[in-house]
Amino acid sequence: MAAPRPCADGPCCSHPSAAPGVQQTLDEMDFERGIWSAALNGDLGRVKYLIQKAVDPSQPDSAGYTALHYASRNGHYAVCQFLLESGAKCDAQTHGGATALHRASYCGHTDIARLLLSHGSNPRLVDADGMTSLHKAAEKGHVDICSLLLQHSPALKAVRDRKSRLACDLLPGNSDLRDLLAS
């Protein structure tokens, strides 16, 4: 078999001789073309277009993340709202057990956490490390989200992760939050 030749205008990414960093995996190409990239970037128009073309709003990518995970993590409220209204599963879990509520809580997006809870998201779900959304919010010192989660489920204070830590054990030093979680 002959060795691949470069294209007339230089190396092609489909050739083994392509420059490193130019090659993309099929997973990366699927991600960029799929609903996940649109949600990650807050591209509501593209998300709507893909949903209208019968893309499942809860379809996971190769890592188990859904469009709702990406939109929640990046604070794209309108995209989250549209996905939920289009039937996205609010409690879909990644391979590591994270939900969209975990992502919103960790990243400090109170409005999205509130939206997810209003659509029935379960704040008691744990990820592979045994952490709830409260653990994630406490770890980053997000007072408003901790308060919101405790309003929905006061029992979260007593949940220990796989290392036997309570949410209050993960605090970065915020005494107001420590009082809220310890009481």
Swiss-Prot record:
Coiled coil: none annotated. ANK repeats lie at residues 30-59, 63-92, 96-125, 129-158. It holds the Pfam family Ank_2. InterPro entries: Ankyrin_rpt, Ankyrin_rpt-contain_sf. The modification Phosphoserine is found at S153. PROSITE patterns: ANK_REP_REGION, ANK_REPEAT. Keywords: ANK repeat, Phosphoprotein, Repeat. Gene3D superfamilies: Ankyrin repeat-containing domain (1.25.40.20). Belongs to the ANKRD39 family. This is Ankyrin repeat domain-containing protein 39. It comes from Bos taurus (Bovine). The lineage of its organism: Eukaryota, Metazoa, Chordata, Craniata, Vertebrata. The gene is ANKRD39.
